């Protein structure tokens, strides 16, 4: 870890003539704490420290912030085992790592000419599964059939068309609020997390699920269930990380698979899942020859999605989630503009690149 004196010198000597540029990582502090010691940003403390260290090594002034005061902001930089509070000018580029940056703060920075690592149009697509579906369905990609719920939704039609379907929030994340309905020998079952129950009245049950989801989320989707290939009794998917580098060029940083806890609907790492190399899973399940074809298709699909998003608005990074069915067909499930890095701990080189590229691209934006 670079010493505090290095950060201090950068802050004191910051000026345009020295070609120093500032990058702000936006994330609200853990306000349950009454001081600046220890972890301030929950699971992201170590991530932020790596970003700041990489930025300093490239000559950038990097800090974490969440509060604005006119043309200044209250920032934090690592000091010892905690964080040191500083007052500094607003950054030239912002990397948002908070789940929800208030629109008034984003607007205030935007009017001052601040660049954003990931732009609003791409974030809006990632945060809304219905919007995402409508963007990508116009392109040659495999997508599960998706429909927005309304009071006139034809439950009979969907139950006749699919033996598996999901009821989920439009704007959910980390596997929250996802219910699956599956028909087994002409009997419907509803599953949420670890609990599966027989359904006597499908229409009534779906309506109650919709009411439950709407207590916490906005709109609700009905989505076709993919007959996924299971890996050791677990649902698995593929997370691809696409990022721009220090020259603003798109690169496929890497991809790995998330394997869910046996018996659960999702593969999310936050609900008991674990990471494994996609190549190992695919080879074990499909054999060496088909593995090569599937891996190549994963790459092609990821680049196709990247070009579509870039045509809407150039972005810094996106996580792409793909599912493989029992026939080896690959489906796009969702995209994420705040992808985690924990999945890439199993491959150190990929993890290192995944941590360094955001700050490098922020530097590119700050200087452009």
Regions of interest found by a model, annotated:
Residues 175, 258-266, 336-348:
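Glycine-rich phosphate/pyrophosphate-binding beta-alpha loops
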Residues 1-16, 191-192:
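N-terminal accessory interaction module
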Residues 275-316, 324-368:
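C-terminal active-site "lid" helix and adjoining low-complexity regulatory extension at the edge
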Residues 31-43, 343-349:
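Short, flexible/disordered intra-domain loops and linkers
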Residues 140-179:
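Rossmann-like NAD(P)H-binding beta-loop-alpha module
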Residues 159-164, 176, 183-273:
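Phosphate-binding site of ATP-dependent enzymes
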Residues 39-153:
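Conserved N-proximal alpha/beta basic substrate-recognition cap immediately N-terminal to
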Residues 63-67, 221-225, 237-238, 311-327:
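A short glycine-rich, hydrophobically flanked beta-strand micro-motif that places a catalytic Asp/Glu
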